Amino acid sequence: MKIKLTTVYVDDQEKALHFYTGTMAFQKKADFSNGPFRWLTVVSPEDPNGMELQLALNSNPAAKAWQQALFQQSQPAAMFFTDNLQADYEGMKARGAEFTMPPTDVTASKIAMLKDTCGNLIQVTELKRW
């Protein structure tokens, strides 16, 4: 058994696709509709057959409330890892990302936080090498 998918709820799937493929530089993996429902996932270009991130519309009131509560409490909806936070920070900033926290040293890592334009905060983490 393995983990293959996680979900981020978004207020606009097209806007989310633009952000996650443009600003974050991920790749679209799946995009198909079934009636009013759209299944949309992105993956890291470094691991195109690995973990998928579903960009799900927050049309369910519980999903919307959860998304808003996380954002209001400055909690990330998702966390991504990198080997070079400073380079990724500069690249995303150049592509228009709005960071709420620049790269910051914490106990075992460096982290940065940005808005995904769709109602979420995203944390990008570089683990420190000991």
Residue ranges of predicted features:
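Vicinal oxygen chelate
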Residues: 1-5, 27-81, 89-115, 126-130
